[in-house]
Design a protein with these regions (language model features):
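Carbohydrate-interacting/catalytic domains
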Residues: 1-165
C-alpha cells in the first residue's frame, strides 16, 4: 500500500491502482495474521501542492470509499480461525469463523473478472442468509442444509459476506 514515501512526488513514488486498494486493505484488515495499518489519505483523502522540476504540481489523493466499511467489518466480524481458499490465480477467499461474541465473515476478492467460491461453513450455518457488508453485491445468498453456498464477487472487487440479522 502507499505511504508518505511512496505517494506522488516522493522519493519512492510507486502508485497503487485505486481499484486494487480495497483488495489490499481487505487482506491487511481482515486476515488473522496481518498487521493492520491505514494510510491517512486513504481514509480521509488529501490534497497538496509540491514542486517537480521547478513547476508547481497539484496532487489530489482521493479516499478509498470502501475503507470505512472494511474498518467496521474488522471490528465486527474479523475474529476466529481463518480458512483460506487460495485455489485460483485471480479469485481468492477466506473465512473468518468468528468467536463466542462475533459471527465471522466470508471475504472474497477478484483482481480480474467476476469470481465465485463454493464454501461450506458447516451445519451451524445451515439455511442461513448472507449479505455483502460492503454492498458491492446486492443479492442475498442462502446456504443449504449443510451450510454450503456459492459466494460471488464483482470484477476487480472485494465482498465481505456476513450473516443477515
Amino acid at each position: 500500500m502507499e505511504n508518505h514515501d511512496t505517494q506522488q512526488l516522493q522519493a519512492l513514488e510507486s502508485a497503487v491502482k485505486d481499484w486494487f486498494k480495497p483488495l489490499a486493505y481487505a487482506i491487511i484488515l481482515l486476515t488473522d495474521e496481518a498487521y493492520p495499518c491505514v494510510f491517512y489519505p486513504d481514509l480521509f483523502g488529501a490534497e497538496y501542492i509540491d514542486i517537480k522540476e521547478d513547476q508547481e504540481v497539484h496532487i489530489i489523493m482521493p479516499k478509498v470509499e470502501e475503507l470505512p466499511g472494511l474498518l467496521e467489518a474488522r471490528k465486527l466480524f474479523a475474529y476466529g480461525k481463518q480458512i483460506d481458499y487460495f485455489d485460483h490465480p485471480n479469485c481468492i477467499a477466506f473465512v473468518r469463523t468468528g468467536d463466542e461474541t462475533h459471527p465471522g465473515c466470508v471475504v472474497i476478492m477478484s483482481n480480474s473478472e467476476e469470481g465465485y467460491k463454493e464454501i461450506e461453513l458447516g451445519k451451524e450455518h445451515a439455511d442461513s442468509v448472507y449479505i455483502d457488508f460492503l454492498k458491492n453485491r446486492h443479492e442475498e445468498i442462502s446456504t443449504d442444509q449443510n451450510g454450503k453456498a456459492v459466494f460471488r464477487v464483482n470484477p476487480g472487487s472485494v465482498s465481505v459476506w456476513v450473516r443477515k440479522q
